[in-house]
From Swiss-Prot:
Belongs to the beta-lactamase family. It catalyses: a beta-lactam + H2O = a substituted beta-amino acid. It comes from Arthroderma benhamiae (strain ATCC MYA-4681 / CBS 112371) (Trichophyton mentagrophytes). Glycans are attached at residues 70, 102, 147, 156, 195, 249, 461, 473. This is Beta-lactamase-like protein ARB_00930. The lineage of its organism: Eukaryota, Fungi, Dikarya, Ascomycota, Pezizomycotina. The keyword Secreted applies. Its main location: secreted. GO terms for cellular component: extracellular region. It is found in: Secreted.
Length: 595
């Protein structure tokens, strides 16, 4: 017990005497994911406004911010909770630019785009579905990299680190982003003159042929690391080439075959594969340098796939319903950060680009984690966003000029439209938990043993569901919890004046009636911050941000073996209503909800 207690106190010793700022809420869903989104008026209103805005932009009635005549795009909002049964699409919008004279003449959800580094999602998925041990060193599968004189300790580079951008190896394959035709420019800029033999023997545009896999591995032995493994995230295309070559050596199958068997066929994807795709279905930008039809070779795992809006929507939907891997827990593990950047708002996953933002729901501001992946190929930009908290996603592909900002503008516009709407819908549907619950005396219960329990819940402008009051035999139980905390854990800090409950995602059948489920919720023990600068005259105080510690106080208070923060709602899923609540630490049994 002492060890656990010190574990909680140590962060305070290192930072402040305080705990978290009021409102230090749990991560993840703050209310249950809303369902039947296709029937939601909030969603309908938001997407209708969004469609009108995009109509105005592509027609020139408002400033779009990109070359309308030369930029085609497809965008969708998806969810497993009410979206199309196959793709999950709730809403979609397509624009075929008038100058896109090649490729498809009918742009729809099955039209093909290059998706650039969104390919990394497919490759990481392939790795996660494989039978290899992700802790294995890359040299187990690519022994050519074993070389004592190599600046990189390849024996220390695991498959897992490669998939998480944490290996510290070079960003690109041999010759990538090296352009021999720029030699005159380099000299004019003062760079030293070089001979052709100074360049790598393969992979240099306009100088020599592309590297074979064997030549690539030979040259990599001489490459220098960018950092130590796990020192910091370093974005790497090369990493995906290497672990895909490792999988190919392990299975005896090439990347395209593995992708077909493990990802494309199981997900029933109809317009996804290794470039090149089908010209007649392609969205081909009318620009001089565009990548449609290119053969990406061993670079395909990091950025050489094509796909369609429907296929990417299916991918995101299967991630959101947790069915894309062997079990829901594996998918939830995938949707976790692996490292941090210097920005408080940017984390790195496998291979997710995670944006943490609190400005997308201005009426009810709170932190939202957007698990995104962007991708670019010459003339193409794609973006997928997975918002697990709400069970929704956004998919976007564009084809146009190399300097187009269309993807960035449209992506933000769509997120700004859908997230407030789905927040409103989540609050509306969570209204079924709101109300008054009162216990009833059972027929055979002695009158002297009966102690009425009353609970009142509300939804206000804060997060989760607020416990307005909880009493037993007219005793204020919420105040009682605060006093118990103060008596036993006051060193940690004092509980905030409000108590709110949040869903845990745990539910089970309540009875043999399959429509009734028990949903576990937990009270968030949020703490009032103490400010060092108010307690001491020592210099330098008040500069450290308060530490968010409510995640450390879950499941702490117990009453005779039962957690005091656990509340169980009894939900009739077929009827869409809450029929009662159980407060286990009060030994309440089921307390009926008053109509």
């Amino acid at each position: 017990m002492v060890v656990c207690f010190l574990w909680l106190l140590l962060p305070y010793a290192a930072t402040t005497l305080s705990a978290s700022v009021p409102g230090c809420v749990p991560s993840g869903a703050l209310l249950p994911r809303p369902t039947e989104l296709s029937q939601s008026q909030n969603i309908k209103d938001a997407t209708e406004r969004l469609s009108r805005s995009l109509d105005d932009a592509v027609s020139g009635r408002i400033k779009a911010g990109w070359d309308i005549a030369n930029t085609s795009f497809s965008v969708s909002i998806v969810s497993p909770n009410g979206g199309d049964p196959r793709t999950g699409v709730l809403w979609e919008y397509h624009h075929l630019a008038e100058k896109n004279i090649n490729g498809t003449k009918h742009l729809d959800g099955d039209s093909q785009y290059l998706i650039g580094s969104v390919s990394k999602i497919f490759s990481d998925l392939l790795l996660l579905k494989s039978d290899v041990d992700l802790q294995d060193p890359i040299t187990k599968y690519l022994p050519q990299l074993k070389n004592a004189s190599s600046p990189i300790d390849w024996d220390n580079i695991s498959l897992l680190s490669l998939s998480e951008h944490l290996s510290g190896i070079p960003a690109n394959t041999i010759g990538a982003l090296q352009f021999y035709f720029l030699e005159p420019l380099y000299r004019a800029l003062g760079f030293p003159p070089l001979n052709k033999t100074d360049y790598p023997p393969c992979g240099i545009a306009d100088l020599n042929k592309g590297c074979t896999p064997e030549e690539l591995l030979t040259e990599l032995v001489n490459s220098h690391p960018v950092s130590e493994p796990y020192e910091r995230p370093v974005y790497s295309q090369l990493s995906f080439t290497l672990f895909s070559l490792a999988l190919a050596n392990d299975t005896g199958k090439d990347y395209a075959q593995m992708l077909e068997e493990q990802v494309i066929r199981p997900l029933n994807l109809r317009n996804t594969g290794v470039s090149p795709g089908e010209d007649k279905r392609a969205v081909i930008p009318n620009v001089e340098q565009q990548g449609w039809g290119a053969d990406y070779g061993y670079n395909a795992p990091g950025g050489g796939l094509y796909s369609s809006l429907n296929d990417l929507s299916t991918l995101v939907t299967k991630i959101l319903d947790y069915s894309i891997l062997q079990n829901p827990q594996a998918t939830k593990k995938w949707l976790q950060p692996r490292s941090a950047t210097s920005s408080l708002n940017t984390l790195v996953g496998q291979p997710w680009e995670i944006l943490r933002t609190s400005g997308m729901t201005p009426k009810y501001p709170h932190m939202i984690d957007i698990y995104g992946k962007s991708g670019g190929a010459p003339g193409y930009i794609s973006q997928i966003n997975v918002i697990d908290q709400y069970g929704v996603g956004v998919v976007l592909s564009t084809a146009g000029p190399l300097d187009s900002r269309a993807a960035y503008i449209i992506n933000e516009a769509v997120l700004s439209a859908i997230l407030p709407a789905v927040e409103d819908e989540a609050r509306k549907q969570a209204g079924m938990y709101v109300g008054e619950y009162t216990s009833q005396k059972v027929d055979n219960e002695d009158a002297t043993d009966y102690a009425p329990i009353k609970l009142k819940t509300v939804i206000d402008n804060g997060t989760g569901i607020k416990l307005e009051s909880l009493s037993r035999n007219d005793s204020d139980i919420l105040e009682g919890i605060r006093k118990v905390w103060s008596a036993t854990l006051s060193t940690v800090g004092q509980l905030a004046s409000e108590m709110r409950v949040y869903p845990t995602g745990l539910e089970r059948l309540a009875t043999n009636d399959k429509s009734l489920v028990e949903q576990d919720w937990r009270i968030n023990f949020d703490l009032i911050p103490n400010f060092n600068e108010q307690a001491s005259d020592l210099p330098g105080l008040g500069k450290l941000e308060a530490l968010c510690t409510s995640w450390q106080t879950v499941d702490w208070l117990y009453y005779a073996g039962v957690p005091m923060d656990r509340i169980v709602f009894i939900v009739d899923k077929e009827a869409g209503r809450v029929v009662g609540v159980e407060i286990p630490f009060l030994r309440s049994g089921i307390i009926q909800k008053l109509n």
